[in-house]
Amino acid sequence: VSEALKWVLDDIDFFSKKFNIQAGLILTITRGEYAPEHLRSLLGAYKSLGCPAGVIGLDLAGNEDITPPPETASLFRSAKDKYGLGITIHAGETGNADNIRNAIISYGADRIGHGTAVIRSPEIMDLIRELDICIEVCPISNRLTGAVSDVDPHPVGEMINHNIPFVICSDNPAIHRSSLSEDYVAFMQETKNFIVMDNMYETQKRYSFLKGV
């Protein structure tokens, strides 16, 4: 695992310099009974490499109906506190707003992946605003996966109305065969909100796990 992680970080460093960009790696595990074991393995590799600055965060993804062992959350929080890693959790994509609350309270999430269910709970919207948690909105993916039906407006419109922090993201671009630019287009088709789009780059920098952007 350490060797594979080093290869990835070396490539990120090489191409960051080649194209004069800043980039970092978020280590992702999926929900399931082996989630703690997988996270320990990744964190062990991270520590064995001297806690490289190229690793900037941790992510929990996968089926929200699967509850990982309770220790998973404490491992995420511990890594956040000890190493200063950003935490993003896929939650609220399948309609359960309580998963968003759990991601924030139990895992210490700084960002929420998808989070389309947030508009169903005024309480959770208040929590999001109070703690300044950012939603990673993926317009194209949400339609393709059925997280948002073809006949319903995308929840991002209500997020804007309720002052919920969010950024536009791509999700599995190789699988969905779409780019971030196309997600921008989808967002504009949904909202026609030029003000939000004009400020999107600054919003993305604000909530990025990269230091000093």
Model regions: which residues?
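Short acidic/histidine-rich active-site segments
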Residues: 88-94, 164-180
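Short helix-capping segments at alpha-helix termini
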Residues: 14-21, 50-53, 82-85, 192-196
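Mid-to-C-terminal alpha-helical segments outside catalytic/metal-binding sites
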Residues: 130, 181-183, 190-213
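Hydrophobic/aromatic residues located in beta-strands of well-ordered beta-sheets
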Residues: 23-25, 87, 135, 166
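Flexible glycine/proline-rich, aromatic-decorated loop/lid segments
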Residues: 149-161, 175-177, 183
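Short beta-alpha connecting loops at secondary-structure transitions
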Residues: 139-145, 167-169, 185-190
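Catalytic core of soluble alpha/beta enzymes
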Residues: 35-158
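Active-site loop-helix segments enriched in His/Asp/Glu that coordinate
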Residues: 1-27, 36
